Curated annotation (Swiss-Prot):
Species per Swiss-Prot/TrEMBL record: Caenorhabditis elegans
Lipid tethering residues (N-myristoyl glycine): G2
Originating gene: gpa-7
Biological-process GO terms, alphabetical: adenylate cyclase-modulating G protein-coupled receptor signaling pathway
Function: Guanine nucleotide-binding proteins (G proteins) are involved as modulators or transducers in various transmembrane signaling systems.
Boundaries of every G-alpha domain copy: 32-352
Record-given protein name: Guanine nucleotide-binding protein alpha-7 subunit
InterPro entries associated with the record: Gprotein_alpha_I, Gprotein_alpha_su, GproteinA_insert, P-loop_NTPase
Amino acid sequence: MGHCTSKDQKEGKRLNRRIDEQIKKDQSMSLRIIKLLLLGAGESGKSTILKQMRILHKDGFSQQDLEMIRPVVYSNCIHSMLSILRAMFHLQIEYGEPDRVRDSQLVFATVHANKEELTEELAAAMQRLWHDPGVRECYRRSNEYQIDDSAKYFLDNLPRLSSPNYVPSEQDLLRTRIKTTGITEVLFELKGLTFRVIDVGGQRSERKKWIHCFDNVNAIIFISSLSEYDQTLREDNCTNRMQESLKLFDSICNSPWFADIHFILFLNKKDLFAEKIVRSPLTVCFPEYKGQQNQTECINYIQWKFEQLNRSSQREIYCHHTCATDTNNVQFVLDACLDMIIAKNLKSMGLC
C-alpha cells in the first residue's frame, strides 16, 4: 500500500514537472509573438502601411497579384474623375471648353452601365477632361467634396494606365483604395520574433469590430492623416476629419484596455499636407492656431494637439511623420519602431 502511494506520488510529481515545463514553453513562445494593431479613422493610410509591411518584411507582391488589381486601378481612376464631375455641378463650375460636356457624358454613361473598363475612347475623354481648366479648378477645391487621395496620381498617369499592355506597378498597388471591411492581417518574422500586424476598418461602421482584436496586444500604431485637416468625413459630410481623428485617438490612448502597451503615432500623408498647407490655412481646423503657415510649424502643432490628449504620465507617445506611399520613408520609420518594440519585449523577457 505504502509502495503504491510512493509510486503514485513520484508519477504525480513527474506529471506536474511536465505541465510546468509546457507552461514555461508556451509562455516563452507567446512572448516571441508581437501583436501590433493598426488603428485610425477611415482613409488615414492604415491599409497602405500594411501593404508596405508585406513589401518590406514578407515576399512582397507577385506579378499575378499586380495583374489582379488592374480592375481596381481602373475603377479608382474612373471614380476619381466621376467625383470631380459631380462636384462641378454642385460647385457650379463651368468647363473651360464646351466639348468637355460630351466627354463627361461618356464617363457618366460608363459608370451607369457598370462597365469600368478603361477603353481607348474613355481614356482619351478623361485625359481631355483632366486638362480642362474648369476640371482643374474643381480639383483644386477637392477639400469641399469627397474624393480619393490617389485621384491626381491616377489621372496624371492616364496615358500609361490606358496602354494595351498595362500591368500595374507596386506604386500603383500602394495607391489603390478598397474600403477595409473586417480584419486584415500580415505575419512576418524579424530577429527571432513573429510579428502579427492587424488592420481593421477605420470608418465608424467598422469600429465595433475592433474589440475582437484587443487581447494580448503589444503595441498600437495609430495613424492619422495630416492632409485631412480641412476635409469632412465621408460618412456624414459634416464632421472635420482631423477632429474625428483626435477624438478617436483620445478614446484609444486613454482606454484601460491599453494602459500598459506601447503607443506609436504616425502623422501620415505629409507629402499631401505640404502641398495643401500653402493654400489652405490650418485655422480651418484649429481657429486658435497663431503660428506660421509653414509645413514644419503646422505639423509640430498638430503633433502637440495629439500628445496633449495623453493623460498618462507613465506613457510616452512615439510620434513619426510619414508618407505611406514612400517605401523608403516607411522602411526608415518601421525599422525604428520595430527595433524599439523588440528591445522592450526582450526587456520584459529578462533578456536585456
